Amino acid sequence: MTQEELDKIIKKHQHFLKQDCKGWEKMKADLSEEQLEHLVFQNADLAYAVFNRARLYRCTIENCNISHASMVEADLGFSTIKNTKFVDTDFTKASLSDAEFNEVRFSGANLSYARFEWSHAPFCDFTNAKLYEARLNSTYLKSSTFNLADMSFCHLANCCLRECEFVKANLSYAFIHGADLTFAKFDKTDLTEVKHDHGTHGFALACPEKGAFTAFKKIFSKPKRNIWSKDVEPLIVELRVPAKALRSSATSRKCRVSEAKVVSITSLDGERKFDVGYSAHNIHFEYRKGQTVVPNKFDKNRWKQCAPGIHCFITRDEAVQYTDF
């Protein structure tokens, strides 16, 4: 199909959408099994159009609305797709591999059994989408949203899922070997039998599951609200977390514990020793050598990062480098 022929079909489809002329019922765009390689879709409204088994290889799709459409077994491989809506569109068994997506909405779309591998798709919206047994291996999905999505049995090996949201999503039996979930948000997420390994970042607990352990935390020399004042020095407190303490780490290297004993307080370079230091978040919370510190409360939610508890790191260097106050 030529670009001119495609543009004519898109123009006729507008009458189908608006129902504004005689015979509009027969003007719906049906591009099933068409060869559409390298064609350009720009500022087009193709809602409810049919692309089943169409070949859209290396197409450019920009600022389009292709919602409620049917793209069953369509091939969008190596395409570039930007600022486009595929709301409630059916991509069952479609191929979206090696493609470039940017700020694309797949909310409510059916991507079951679709191949979405080796693609670049940051900041995309998959809210309430169905990705049952979809293959997204090695796809870059940073900061995308998967809230309420069905991702059961989904293949996510080696994916970048940093800062993604999975609130109330279903990831049961998903495969996340080698995936990066750092700072991902899990809240009421179904993680039944998720398959992960030593290469999966941000999923396993960063601190020991049981037993006592040593942790480190950055505190400050004075109880001042402005921690960047020249007379306020950052310090490192070494903590001994008892075996009975509750512990959590969400999806980062930062841990939370329900209590800890202050072993030592030193300067960042470790050369000078101190007897007392203060929390950056609560100027009344004191860390004194030899004493046990206990927060007012502790949130038991394993996946909550910013929640009540003693925040700390497993290594001293991580505490030294931490600046997110």
What are these regions (language model features)?
Residues 7-10, 290-291:
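A short linear-motif detector with a strong N-terminal bias
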Residues 1, 24-27, 307-314:
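Short, exposed beta-strand "edge-strand" segments with a Pro/Gly-rich flavor and a Y/T-containing core
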Residues 177-178, 182-325:
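Short, glycine-biased loop/turn motifs at secondary-structure junctions and
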Residues 3-8, 18-231, 247:
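Tandem repeat scaffolds
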Residues 2, 8-9, 279, 304:
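Hydrophobic alpha-helical segments and their boundary regions
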